[in-house]
Amino acid sequence: MEVKSVTKYVRISPQKLRGPVDVIKGQKVEDALNLLKFMPLKAAEIIAKALSSAVANAEHNHEMDVDDLRVKNIIVDQGPTLKRFRARARGRGARILKRSSHLTVIVDATV
């Protein structure tokens, strides 16, 4: 049975979030959390939080055993972009795009 956790409007660009995602797809949940714990990236911390939420959902809502869970899929989608303005020379302005992401973590029990 698939269990998912959705984290929306995370203030990090999808490009930065996709790096650690490729490393942990298909891993056992325990191994994935250990890998994420030792990655020196902000994205790894965000993904670990979402993965822990998916595990808690599986354990509490569906009474699944945590030892049997695997990361089936992780989807990173682009969220809304905040547009900002930085003053430049000669009265001009440069646009700054502050991107956000939506993160969906799907875990599945392997038998």
Curated annotation (Swiss-Prot):
Keyword field: Ribonucleoprotein, Ribosomal protein, RNA-binding, rRNA-binding
Signal peptide stretch: none
InterPro entries for the chain: Ribosomal_uL22, Ribosomal_uL22_bac/chlpt-type, Ribosomal_uL22_bac/org-type, Ribosomal_uL22_CS, Ribosomal_uL22_sf
Gene Ontology biological process terms from the UniProt entry: translation
Pfam families documented for this protein: Ribosomal_L22 (PF00237)
Gene Ontology MF terms: rRNA binding; structural constituent of ribosome
CDD domains in UniProt: Ribosomal_L22
Any Gene Ontology CC annotation: cytosolic large ribosomal subunit
Family statement: Belongs to the universal ribosomal protein uL22 family.
Record's subunit section: Part of the 50S ribosomal subunit.
NCBIfam families, sorted: rplV_bact
Purpose: This protein binds specifically to 23S rRNA; its binding is stimulated by other ribosomal proteins, e.g. L4, L17, and L20. It is important during the early stages of 50S assembly. It makes multiple contacts with different domains of the 23S rRNA in the assembled 50S subunit and ribosome. The globular domain of the protein is located near the polypeptide exit tunnel on the outside of the subunit, while an extended beta-hairpin is found that lines the wall of the exit tunnel in the center of the 70S ribosome.
The protein's name in its UniProt record: Large ribosomal subunit protein uL22
Organism: Desulforapulum autotrophicum (strain ATCC 43914 / DSM 3382 / VKM B-1955 / HRM2)
